[in-house]
């Protein structure tokens, strides 16, 4: 779902769903942003313009995206908290390639497709899983979950991990209490998910 917002100087390629995009759209509209579509991709663009890279902290969903900022010349890559949507990257002479699937990334050629032996060890040890940033191919890496990568015009890059799970035990609630809380959350989640299951715009 590529989209260009000439007014903001931003271009985005987006794969995924932002479940709370309607609420964010209303919030951004109230702050003066004008929308020309009903898609969550445009909400991503407006949110990026409003909050910068911290826009991901407002998103609930599964997503991978790239935003090109014409003003700064930066490319910003982002991935959802749990890494549900993939984002593969490959550094080739004079360019950085990215795609949401390996076949798409490899289609242009010129990428080292030798097997990464460390990744192969992980694959065999962790029941068919290769932890980020490695992939089974030496010339391809994947953006880790909950990561924003900023690629500068000179080719340098910087990663920001915007979320990490917490595992602190809450001793004030029993297992039954947690089950009840979870049951109360589900109807709202279902409504949020159903709202984004809409026909794709032509």
Where do the protein language model's features map onto the residues?
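Cysteine-centered catalytic environments shared across enzyme families
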Residues: 1-202
């Amino acid at each position: 779902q590529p989209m260009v917002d000439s007014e903001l100087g931003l271009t985005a390629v987006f794969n995924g769903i932002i479940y709370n995009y309607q609420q964010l759209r209303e919030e951004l509209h109230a702050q003066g942003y004008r929308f020309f579509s009903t898609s969550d991709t445009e909400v991503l663009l407006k949110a990026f313009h409003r909050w910068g890279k911290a826009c991901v902290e407002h998103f609930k969903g599964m997503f991978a995206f790239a935003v090109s900022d014409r003003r700064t010349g930066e490319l910003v890559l982002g991935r959802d908290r749990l890494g549900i949507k993939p984002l593969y990257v490959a550094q080739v002479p004079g360019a950085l390639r990215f795609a949401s699937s390996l076949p798409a990334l490899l289609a242009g050629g010129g990428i080292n497709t030798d097997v990464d032996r460390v990744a192969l060890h992980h694959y065999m040890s962790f029941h068919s899983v290769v932890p980020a940033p490695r992939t089974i191919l030496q010339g391809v890496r994947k953006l880790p979950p909950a990561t924003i990568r900023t690629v500068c015009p000179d080719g340098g890059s910087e990663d920001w991990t915007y979320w990490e799970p917490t595992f602190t035990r809450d001793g004030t609630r029993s297992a039954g209490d947690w089950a009840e809380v979870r049951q109360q959350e589900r109807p709202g989640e279902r409504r949020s998910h159903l709202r984004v299951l809409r026909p794709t715009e032509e």
